[in-house]
Amino acid sequence: IKLIHTYKENQFQEGVLEDYAYLSKASMRLFQATGDESYFDFSKNITDNALKLFADDQSDLLRYSNNNELFTKVISLDDGVIPSPNSIIAEQLFNIGHIIFDDEYLNLSDKMVSSVQDIIDGNINSYSVWANNILNRVEPFFEIAVIGPNAKSITDDITNYFTPNTIVVQSKIESIIPLFIDRYFEDETYIYVCQNKTCQRPETKIDLALEQIPYIN
């Protein structure tokens, strides 16, 4: 997948890192909201392509553009008027790694966050998304997977709760996504609270499931 930033009168400009980062995050949010795995696949593909196109050979971060003009080698870091595309990609890698149980994505995200740690410490107000990335590492992080025929309605109800340091995902069908494998039952919908590739006892009620996350109660 290759994105086009602008197109006018048969002239086009190739997409920059912001285009890939924001589209990847938007697609991930659609996956979380609908359970449609095509959105997850698209989000992952966009993120993978961003890593290939914008890799910087002198750091663990990503460049603004993949052409060789000097100004495009700039690496955007601050979460100012809009979040840094690097902070968004770090967040995406973290979420993808937790959904597919892939340490490579998690390690790439860790390297990106570690490389800006000193900058963030001195001016956290300008690095809010980076700070959230750090928070996901300082406190335990959980996956909340809602799986079964009523996954959509239960997931919608869970969004009414404050659930920091979690990612909430859903599936109403049997799936090969690692977080969902062998957890689908056609006659019941279960809520799984998982951490470090292991899920706790599945629950059918939201309050009982969230009790498994210590800082929510």
Whereabouts are the PLM-identified features?
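Glycan-recognition and catalytic cores of secretory/periplasmic carbohydrate-active enzymes
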Residues: 1-217
